[in-house]
């Protein structure tokens, strides 16, 4: 990735490359996705912030997406499965009428930023890899006001909503503990 962080604005879901040509405006939402390496171990985190006063529609999107992340984290317990995490996220997002991005998902985290297993933001309870103590995963719902469908822009990095509607992204790296 050519940037130090990912900075994605409004309908940009992930992998926005920071640029001096992008001027934030009152009412925008800005997702910042960062990683860190400490003593050879990786951490990954994202948060979506309001720029000044935002519309009630965008405020609700941020609130629901953050709720999705916390519900996914709550489901990340030994003995549960990846499908339990995805189901918890999907249920909240779709109940709110939002689209759950499917092409981009959470992931295992360790010595590398993206390791197995993939951690989808959608799924069925009691399916997928069983969660065991010692696993470290990034749970990162990407939720769209409109459709879940995405498009990759011409730079080959930036991913936007296909319908141009806003998207929010919240992420935490969590360890599964006994």
Please give the residue ranges for each predicted region.
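Active-site neighborhoods and metal-handling regions in enzymes and metal-associated proteins
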Residues: 1-178
């Amino acid at each position: 990735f050519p940037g130090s962080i990912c900075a994605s604005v409004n309908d940009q879901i992930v992998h926005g490359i920071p640029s001096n040509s992008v001027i934030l405006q009152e009412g925008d939402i800005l997702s910042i996705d960062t990683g860190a390496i400490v003593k050879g171990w990786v951490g990954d985190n994202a948060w979506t912030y309001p720029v000044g006063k935002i519309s009630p529609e965008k405020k609700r999107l941020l609130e629901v997406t953050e709720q999705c992340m916390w519900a996914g984290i709550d489901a990340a317990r030994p003995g549960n499965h990846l499908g339990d995490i995805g189901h918890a996220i999907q249920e909240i997002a779709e109940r709110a009428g939002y689209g759950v991005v499917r092409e981009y998902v959470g992931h295992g985290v360790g010595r590398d930023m993206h390791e197995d297993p993939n951690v989808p933001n959608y799924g069925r309870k009691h399916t997928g890899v069983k969660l065991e103590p010692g696993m470290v995963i990034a749970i990162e719902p990407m939720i769209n006001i409109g459709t879940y469908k995405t498009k990759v822009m011409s730079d080959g990095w930036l991913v936007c909503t296909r319908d141009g509607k806003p998207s929010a992204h919240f992420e935490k790296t969590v360890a599964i503990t006994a």
